[in-house]
Regions:
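Conserved C-terminal active-site "lid" loop/helix of NAD(P)H-dependent oxidoreductases
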Residues: 56, 76, 110-139, 146
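C-terminal "lid/loop" region of Rossmann-like NAD(P)-dependent oxidoreductases
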Residues: 46, 75-77, 86-92, 99-120, ...
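Conserved beta-loop-beta element that borders a ligand/cofactor-binding pocket
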Residues: 1-20
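A short C-terminal helix-loop "cap" of Rossmann-like NAD(P)-dependent dehydrogenase/epimerase domains
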Residues: 5-8, 32-43, 97-109, 125-126
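Protein kinase-like catalytic domain
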Residues: 2, 36, 67, 98, ...
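Amphipathic terminal alpha-helices
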Residues: 141-171
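Glycine/proline-rich active-site loop of Rossmann-fold NAD(P)-dependent oxidoreductases
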Residues: 17-30, 37-42, 56-57, 65-78, ...
């Protein structure tokens, strides 16, 4: 629409946002809540896909940084952490932070259909830096682990546990 009609629009693409209050349908809360339930084995779909997880505050700040920017019209800008990690390694890091010994079982019915699975989802932050002067505060592995700690802490609070029906998605 920008090219065809000179409409002042941009596409802002957030990558795999996670953090407190997220639905248990998403992989990180699924892993955390299954581990909090003291399950010795957790059930996941494809554990080898890699993702570029982005902590919620970074995603929000990325969107806020677009306000009033006219230099982004016609651009596609990624809001991501630029740190890639597999689902399996994400689960392992969560278990380490929670001091839990847990096994992972892959279940076929939890996997996406083969033609819809994205094996590698990677964000480039070059345009976000160039046009928005934005980069994530939770950078690299250290930033990812810090964001996971905040997320685990939130899901570990008893009052917060009551807000979610763990048995609906984590059966």
């Amino acid at each position: 629409f920008y090219t065809s009609y000179n409409l002042p629009v941009s596409i802002i693409r957030p990558f795999n946002t996670f953090g407190p209050r997220q639905s248990l349908r998403a992989v990180i809360p699924t892993i955390i809540t299954q581990a909090l339930s003291n399950n010795k084995t957790i059930k996941l779909g494809n554990t080898y896909s890699t993702r570029n997880f982005n902590f919620i505050s970074d995603t929000v700040n990325g969107f806020i940084s677009t306000i009033g920017k006219k230099n982004i019209f016609g651009e596609v800008i990624n809001i991501g952490s630029n740190y890639d990690i597999s689902i399996k390694d994400t689960a392992s890091e969560i278990f380490k932070l929670m001091k839990k010994k847990v096994n992972i079982t892959e279940e076929n019915f939890r996997k996406r259909p083969e033609k819809s699975e994205v094996e590698v989802l990677k964000a480039s932050g070059l345009k976000a830096k160039k046009f928005l002067n934005w980069s994530p505060k939770f950078k690299g592995k250290a930033g990812f682990l810090k964001a996971l700690e905040k997320t685990i802490k939130w899901y570990s609070i008893e009052d917060n546990k009551k807000k979610f029906k763990n048995n609906i998605y984590n059966f």
